[in-house]
Each structure stands twice: as structure tokens, then as C-alpha cells.
């Protein structure tokens, strides 16, 4: 996900 999405808070865009 995004740097701070709310779900995983970090991933591959």
C-alpha cells in the first residue's frame, strides 16, 4: 500500500 495507508501502512505502491 502507500507509506501510511491505514491497512498495512507500507508496501509496494
Curated annotation (Swiss-Prot):
Q: Which GO terms describe its biological process?
A: chitin catabolic process; defense response to insect; polysaccharide catabolic process
Question: Under the cellular component aspect of Gene Ontology, which terms does the record hold?
Answer: extracellular region
Keywords, A to Z, come to: Carbohydrate metabolism, Chitin degradation, Chitin-binding, Glycoprotein, Glycosidase, Hydrolase, Plant defense, Polysaccharide degradation, Secreted
Q: Locate the coiled-coil region(s) and give their ranges.
A: none
UniProt KW Glycoprotein keyword: yes
Q: So what EC number does this one have?
A: 3.2.1.132, 3.2.1.14
| Record localization | Secreted
Q: What class of enzyme is it?
A: hydrolase
Task: Establish whether keyword Endoplasmic reticulum is in the entry.
Answer: no
> What is the recorded post-translational modification?
Glycosylated; contains galactose.
Chitin-binding type-1 domain: which residues?
A: 3-13
Q: Which GO terms describe its molecular function?
A: chitin binding; chitinase activity; chitosanase activity; endochitinase activity
Q: What does this protein's UniProt record list under function?
A: Has insecticidal activity when consumed by D.melanogaster larvae. Has low chitinase and chitosanase activity.
Supply the name of the protein.
Insecticidal protein LA-a
Amino acid at each position: 500500500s502507500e507509506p501510511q495507508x491505514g491497512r498495512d501502512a507500507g508496501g509496494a505502491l
